């Protein structure tokens, strides 16, 4: 799979409307396939059954936050036979989460934060930073 391959992205966010907007923006402007889940438990199952190039998780979700979900996926990947490579993570954060989320940037695999509310162009830039080989298919106005 060269850099021209379609990148696969998993979004987990309990804000369904925002998740749909993110998916639409990614698939409109970048060459990628996007799976989504408003439910961290189902997102975990998707991550175990499919292979992704990038994870985009909401930091603040009920039951399991984005950081914990990433940690659990990492543990499962490390214990898989053969061990799997954990894709990079972009965390989407809301107000009040910034301080803890900033600390998570020091963790291996956490590639960036996008604070809500955000401009779609900012998110697209972050995705391109995480996936340097991703191809653009359109240009946002």
Write out the residue ranges for each language-model feature.
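A Lys-centered signature of the CheY-like receiver
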Residues: 116
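Short amphipathic alpha-helix used as the core "switch/output" element in two-component signaling
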Residues: 45, 67-85
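Active-site residues of response regulator receiver
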Residues: 58
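Two-component/phosphorelay signaling modules centered on CheY-like receiver
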Residues: 16-35
């Amino acid at each position: 799979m060269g850099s021209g391959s379609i990148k696969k992205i998993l979004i987990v966010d309990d804000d369904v409307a925002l998740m749909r907007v993110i998916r639409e923006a990614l698939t409109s402007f970048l060459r990628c396939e996007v799976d989504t889940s408003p439910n961290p438990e189902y997102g975990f199952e998707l991550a175990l059954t499919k292979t992704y190039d990038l994870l985009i998780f909401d930091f603040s979700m009920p039951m399991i936050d984005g950081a914990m979900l990433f940690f659990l996926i990492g543990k499962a990947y490390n214990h898989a036979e053969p061990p799997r490579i954990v894709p990079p993570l972009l965390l989407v954060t809301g107000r009040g989460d910034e301080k803890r989320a900033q600390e998570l940037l020091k963790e291996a695999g956490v590639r960036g934060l996008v604070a809500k509310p955000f401009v779609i162009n900012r998110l697209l830039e972050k995705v391109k930073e995480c996936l340097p080989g991703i191809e653009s298919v359109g240009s946002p106005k």
